[in-house]
């Protein structure tokens, strides 16, 4: 739990960006009495007079970070390398060879080549092991994942030579791959969950999210979709514009989606244009404690405009807007310049103490310990945080995330301590990869269609036994039979979903997992009863 919380708090996807020139309207005052002058003199003195050699770059970067840490939890500085990685995840593409992979025992195992990507074009297959890149061994040499990715990626049009080991073939295979633009998808999956109801899960809000979303919507409409479950669970946010585009699809012309306002930044409103394709039909939005930022904008807009019902648990509570300020070396500062407000006037930013990032990162852990994730009765808001939706005048709250209309507790029967430990040690995923490596060809032949797989495939007991045995070997065991039984129900569903992902894609993964999801099942119940 703590690892995921810290990761979420630090993730770049928590940021909402203003699309404005980085240095626009910035004023620089280096007069004799300016605090900036003092900072400049200190840096010059240290660089020229300090007793030992000084890393000037690091000194300045640490100084910037130190200043930002005193402001708020979301004003941050990233190096050029970190900024480049962030932009790739949000801009929708990067240059590379186009494979989904996992590391298995210090070897890169191809899960799936990207459809129509450079690796698929030359014949690289799921299950292939890449052992060398341009004659440099990457298998069995303790090379970091980051270093391997650096070697595989490169400018579009450049070539990279790969050495591959393929199951059933004794000799090594050699491929020359021409790098190309590889899309980074932000829609995790979509499918018809019931005859008239579609399901779309958005993982983050990037430059291509709206295009991906409309592709899914149009395909689902052709299959008879009238209602939609929009899954924003674990969505850390992203681009403000993408959130506005998605919300626009559901709302009437002139409906307020969100507005922003800061000390210097004037009030800026974003209204629906009235050209959306989802203005009719029932909508349910799924959220949890890891739903943040741009995802909360969409959720708040649909809730405040009484366009959709929100199901799940209280969202993260990130209501600050960052403006990117680029530095000449490619690094970037993201400075909080405004708050954002939902249509009813809610600022859903949760409280924070300036300069105390650790306390902020522990807030979700406090919810967990306080019992909020299991009971809505443990959540209390001051009357000053009470607001009302714009059409039906239902009570909603600000100041700490978005409260769902229907609360669904975290399922402790599924997420046992035993299962968390197995996952933490990578025992489940590692043995799933080994199983697929040995059985991929047979499974694809036996189940050419996902519907057959979903209806008839059962995870073999031998795979379960292998996982339990490996856990025991690493001193990971259930505390009693009851915990084991609860774990096995979820573990079987998880393994079936992972195998489906390997054979097909993420949409099939979620089709399996959603059969076990209490949040999804509650949404379906509400749709049937409304």
Write out the residue ranges for each language-model feature.
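Conserved functional hotspot residues or short segments at active or partner-binding sites
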Residues: 347-348, 352-530
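Bacterial Sec-dependent N-terminal signal peptides
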Residues: 1-32
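Flexible, acidic/glycine-enriched loop-and-adjacent beta/alpha segments
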Residues: 311-341, 354-368, 374-381
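Cleft-lining beta-strand/loop regions that shape enzyme active-site pockets
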Residues: 23-35, 39-56, 79, 109-112, ...
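PDZ/PDZ-like peptide-tail recognition elements
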Residues: 62, 74-112
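Hydrophobic beta-strand signal
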Residues: 131-132, 258, 309, 334, ...
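An acidic helix/loop motif centered on a single conserved Asp/Glu
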Residues: 54-71
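Structural motif
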Residues: 127-129
């Amino acid at each position: 739990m703590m690892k995921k919380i810290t990761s979420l708090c630090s993730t770049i996807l928590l940021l909402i960006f203003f699309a404005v020139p980085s240095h626009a309207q910035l004023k620089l005052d280096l007069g004799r009495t300016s605090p900036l002058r003092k900072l400049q003199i200190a840096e010059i003195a240290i660089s020229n007079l300090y007793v030992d050699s000084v890393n000037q770059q690091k000194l300045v970067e640490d100084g910037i970070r130190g200043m930002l840490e005193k402001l708020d939890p979301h004003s941050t500085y990233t190096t050029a390398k970190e900024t480049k990685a962030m932009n790739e995840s949000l801009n929708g593409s990067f240059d590379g060879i186009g494979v989904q992979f996992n590391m298995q025992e210090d070897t890169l195992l191809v899960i799936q080549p990207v459809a129509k990507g450079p690796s698929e074009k030359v014949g690289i297959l799921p299950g292939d092991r890449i052992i060398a890149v341009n004659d440099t061994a990457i298998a069995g040499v303790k090379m970091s994942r980051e270093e391997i990715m650096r070697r595989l990626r490169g400018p579009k049009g450049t070539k990279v030579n790969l050495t591959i080991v393929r199951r059933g073939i004794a000799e090594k295979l050699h491929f020359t791959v021409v790098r190309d633009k590889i899309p980074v998808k932000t829609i995790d999956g979509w499918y018809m969950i019931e005859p008239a109801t579609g399901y779309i899960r958005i993982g983050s809000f990037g430059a291509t999210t709206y295009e991906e979303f409309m592709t899914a919507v149009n395909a689902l409409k052709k299959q008879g979709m009238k209602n939609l479950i929009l899954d924003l669970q674990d969505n850390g946010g992203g681009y403000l514009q993408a959130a506005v585009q998605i919300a626009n699809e559901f709302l009437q012309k002139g409906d307020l989606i969100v507005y922003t306002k800061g000390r210097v930044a004037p009030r800026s409103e974003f209204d629906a244009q009235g050209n959306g394709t989802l203005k009719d039909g029932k909508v349910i939005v799924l959220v949890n404690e890891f739903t943040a930022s741009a995802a909360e904008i969409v959720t708040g807009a649909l809730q405040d405009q009484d366009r959709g019902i929100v199901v799940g648990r209280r969202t993260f509570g990130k209501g600050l807007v960052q403006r990117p300020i680029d530095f000449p070396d490619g690094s970037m500062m993201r400075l909080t310049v405004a708050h954002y407000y939902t249509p009813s006037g809610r600022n859903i930013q949760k409280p924070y103490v300036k300069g105390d990032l650790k306390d902020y990162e522990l807030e979700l852990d406090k919810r967990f310990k306080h019992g909020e994730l299991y009971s809505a009765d443990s959540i209390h808001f001051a009357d000053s945080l009470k607001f009302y939706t714009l059409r039906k005048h239902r009570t909603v709250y600000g100041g700490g995330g978005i409260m769902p209309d229907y609360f669904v507790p975290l399922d402790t029967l599924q997420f046992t301590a035993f299962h968390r430990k197995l996952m933490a040690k990578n025992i489940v995923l590692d043995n799933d990869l080994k199983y697929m490596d040995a059985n991929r060809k047979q499974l694809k032949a036996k189940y050419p269609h996902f519907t057959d797989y979903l209806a008839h495939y059962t995870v073999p007991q031998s795979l379960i036994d292998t996982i339990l045995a490996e856990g025991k070997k690493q001193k990971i065991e259930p505390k009693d039979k009851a915990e084991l039984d609860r774990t096995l129900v979820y573990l079987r569903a998880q393994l079936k979903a992972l195998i489906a992902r390997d054979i097909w894609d993420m949409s099939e993964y979620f089709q399996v997992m959603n059969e076990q999801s209490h949040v999804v099942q509650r949404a379906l119940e509400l749709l049937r009863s409304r």
